[in-house]
Swiss-Prot record:
Lineage: Eukaryota, Metazoa, Ecdysozoa, Nematoda, Chromadorea
Segments forming a coiled coil: none
UniProt-recorded name of the protein: Serpentine receptor class alpha-7
Family label: Belongs to the nematode receptor-like protein sra family.
Pfam families in the record: 7TM_GPCR_Sra
Acetylation in keyword set: no
CC annotations in GO: membrane
Encoding gene (name): sra-7
Length: 329
């Protein structure tokens, strides 16, 4: 029989499986992409984007949350691969006590919560930019900082709520797993995350439609039309990111729920062969900076192409006015 702080037979079987090891390398690749594209995302948002100051503050907050999760998950993936390659044949594969994992897990949950709540924060900020008439730089800064502080507070307390009153007397293979007495509460929060992502999706669709409708009611004057175009472009980008996050959160939540429902029909090996791929948070974290860079660059290229076409073509007055309208729309 294994000692309490040594891995059990099914933990060892999971570590030694090729499927599990491949999943860790996939996560490591996603983590590397997150770090690389986050650098480019910060650079392009700061220098070349049309985002307002409040949007930039919240985008940077989301990028920090994504990288925080990936950094901690990096340590976990490396530890598990280290155990799989160098400890698998040892008499005792060492586990970590739940108490020792507590600080690590709290920070990890802060990163996850920051990404989910951060997307809601971005949509609220876009709502403020849409409905506040005099959304100047000072107002934008106040909104961005206020929402960012609220997100940080909620993210910090989420981990404490999940692990609240847990005796922390067990042992874990890695610190990305929840303590045994907190598993049910963690599943509840996973469902809440999915609900929030669903709310974000609905809110983003309504907000985008409202902005599009409002654009057509804006008089064809260069200043107002340009500012409205900026709001629509930035809001469309946030809505796109929200949609992607919803898809992966739905896969995570619904996938885990389905597996738990049919758990009795699966062997231990079958269950863990599938469940390892339903943890989609590393995908969400990696796709955020990648898609952010893609959307900003594609928007820029589209505008440059239109302007070049516009300046090279000789037109009548009616054609000129028609193309102007197409540029703004």
């Amino acid at each position: 029989m294994s000692a309490p702080n040594c891995a059990r037979k099914y933990d060892i079987a999971r570590l030694s499986s090729l499927n599990f090891q491949i999943s860790q390398y996939v996560y490591l690749s996603l983590i590397s992409l997150t770090f690389i594209f986050s650098y480019f995302a910060v650079k392009i948002v700061h220098q070349k984007s049309i985002f307002q100051l409040s949007t930039k503050i919240l985008l940077f907050h989301n990028l920090v949350s994504a990288n925080l999760h990936q950094l901690l998950y990096l340590f976990s993936a490396l530890r598990r691969l280290n155990l799989a390659y160098f400890y698998i044949d040892e008499p005792c594969v060492p586990l970590i006590s739940e108490a020792d994992c507590l600080p690590y897990l709290k920070v990890l949950v802060t990163g996850i919560s920051g990404m989910i709540y951060g997307q809601t924060g971005l949509l609220l900020e876009r709502g403020c930019a849409t409905f506040i008439k005099d959304y100047d730089k000072k107002t934008s800064m106040f909104v961005g900082i206020a929402i960012s502080i609220a997100i940080l507070f909620l993210s910090l307390i989420t981990g404490k709520i999940i692990i609240w009153d847990d005796p922390l007397q067990g042992y874990l293979l890695s610190c990305v797993s929840y303590p045994s007495q907190s598993v049910e509460r963690s599943r509840l929060f996973a469902s809440i995350y999915t609900f929030i992502s669903s709310f974000n999706l609905v809110f983003s669709v309504l907000l985008r439609r409202y902005n599009k409708k409002l654009e057509y009611s804006t008089p064809f004057v260069v200043g107002p039309r340009f500012r409205k175009r900026e709001v629509i472009d930035s809001t469309s980008t946030i809505c796109f990111l929200t949609f992607v996050q919803f898809i992966f959160m739905f896969i995570y939540s619904f996938g885990i729920f389905t597996l738990k429902t049919i758990r009795s029909m699966l062997t231990y090996r079958q269950y863990y062969f599938i469940v390892v791929w339903f943890y989609t948070i590393p995908f969400i974290a990696a796709l955020f900076p990648i898609l952010l860079v893609y959307r900003i660059r594609s928007s820029h290229v589209s505008r440059v192409t239109i302007i070049k076409t516009f300046t090279k073509t000789k037109q009548t007055q009616e054609e000129h006015i028609k193309q102007l309208k197409n540029v703004w729309n």
